[in-house]
């Protein structure tokens, strides 16, 4: 299990979830309520899914995460990220690309996020 779940939007680290930090009990209870709501079905890609499987739930929550980020709804993004991190312990990254054509994202299970920094050197000539 990866201890970090990274959210990368347009190649920039946007959010990260540290699985090593325990989720407070009231937040865990809220995620459990979300799971119960999923049992009633979800709308995904304009269609009602009466009994969503884990992959469909994950896609739904990843969409919610992206909307939370794009519309600066921090609570929505935080809940969505916590759900993904706790329900998919092997998930390493949510990679998204946002442009004028819309938002596309992938759930990445096989590649840890690598921190990188751009370093400029001046005066070396």
Placement of each model-derived feature along the sequence:
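Short loop/turn motifs enriched for small/polar and acidic residues
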Residues: 97-99
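Compositionally biased, non-globular sequence tracts
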Residues: 1-81, 87, 106-125
């Amino acid at each position: 299990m990866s201890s970090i779940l990274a959210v990368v939007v347009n190649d920039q680290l946007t959010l990260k979830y540290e699985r090593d930090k325990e989720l407070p009990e009231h937040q865990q209870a809220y995620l459990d309520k979300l799971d119960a709501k999923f049992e009633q079905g979800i709308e995904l890609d304009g269609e009602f899914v009466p009994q969503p499987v884990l992959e469909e739930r994950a896609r739904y929550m990843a969409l919610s995460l992206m909307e939370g980020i794009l519309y600066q709804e921090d609570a929505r993004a935080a809940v969505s990220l916590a759900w993904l991190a706790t329900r998919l312990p092997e998930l390493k990254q949510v990679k998204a690309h946002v442009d004028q054509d819309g938002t596309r994202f992938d759930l990445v299970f096989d590649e840890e996020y690598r921190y990188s920094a751009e370093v400029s050197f001046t005066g070396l000539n």
